[in-house]
Amino acid sequence: EIQFVIVLRLAGKTRDHVLSMRAVLLTGETLETSVISDEELDALPESSTESRIGRALRSLHDENLDEIEAAFPVLNRCLTGYDLKHVRTTDGDIDLNAVLCGSEGTLGLISEATINLEPLPTEIGLVAVQYESFMDALFDARELMQHGATSIETVDSTVLNLAMNDFVWDSVQAYFPSSEKTLQGINLVEFTDFDAASLALKMDAFSRHLDTVAEAGGRSFAHAIARGRAQVNQVWAMRKRAVGLLGGLQGTKKPVAFVEDTCVPPENLAPFIGEFRELLDAHALDYGMFGHVDAGVLHVRPALDLKAPESLELMRTITDQVVDLTKKYHGLLWGEHGKGVRSEYAPVFFGALYPAICQIKALFDPQNRLNPGKIAGPTPDTPLRKIDEVPLRAHSDRRIVEG
């Protein structure tokens, strides 16, 4: 996931690099999608699948501009499924790829795609910035974003402590030397470039800036530099293993990824997470937090015993509360991992645009047979998947325990 996130920041979203696609619809028709002008769309035979769907999508976009503007927040993540906002490109052309990208198999089966490839920077380095509190790391992140970093990852004390008590810490301890101050949060600030000398200049300038801020009483108390892919990979391996260790907690309660990928504008992230932590603490839950602070994405997995019926009720309560919280901070419940079984909240985030989203579903799948209950139905009153009504392994585990 870490490498995916870094590529996303460098190159943009999938839809930015899909040149054309071929999809098979439920009727057996094939749909060829690409970016075309209004004139090219109008010139297509009216009986063709491309004309029928292309003209309908164009009308839905052009007739709902105010609703689109209100529904789609200004984020570097997207209100996926269905991306009506980007049916028109910045040049005014029609991009039929945009609706299929992120549709989670609800519109058709993509059988072929032509994509654009971009070169990745060859040089890489990372600065591990250390804090006495996770909130200090979060509040500092916005300022750190002003220095040209490729990515900024944050990790809380729960995840850090798991790493410190694991053998993986031996490989990165040099970057986190002992201090009289207690390490409770880190920002991992990655820089990339195509030129080694240019990268070194950026990183050294950033290091000097951190020294100056620390001397003036800034939030961080230390930092260390990892240069080159081998050293950087050591740090990322620590982060990856620590997150994996979250899933191995002792006892019946295990981290559950149901509010896994909230996303808010980066400038709202620190106060958003502050309230998010208060929400989870009020339910006396254990949890670990990590995320992509430059993108405003937070990953959190509260520990629940899903064999207990009251935990399922709590999962519903927490999700409802987090939905309200993300709306308050102009964000999304799903910043990276799609809607899936959380689709019941799609009408909340699409708002007045939701009927148009349902029209897209009806255009492609009027019988609601492709991944039914996810993202949208062919009519606004079509039932959607609910998080506390999907089959869970815990249901089977409960029968084993009871038996």
Over which residues does each language-model region extend?
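Active-site capping/gating regions of soluble enzymes
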Residues: D16-L19, A23, D95, L107, ...
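Glycine-centered flexibility motif
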Residues: V5, G12, L79-G81, D193-A196, ...
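FAD-binding subdomain of flavoenzyme oxidoreductases
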Residues: E1-A141, P366-G377, D381-G403
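C-terminal substrate-recognition/cap domain of FAD-linked oxidoreductases
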Residues: T90-D91, N97-T317, V323-L325, Y329-L332, ...
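Short, structured secondary-structure boundary patches
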Residues: Q3-R9, Q173-P177, A308-L312, A352-Q359
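Non-transmembrane, interaction-prone segments in cytosolic or luminal domains
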Residues: V7, K13, V24-P45, T154-L162, ...
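Exposed alpha-helical structural elements
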Residues: R52, A56, E67, S198, ...
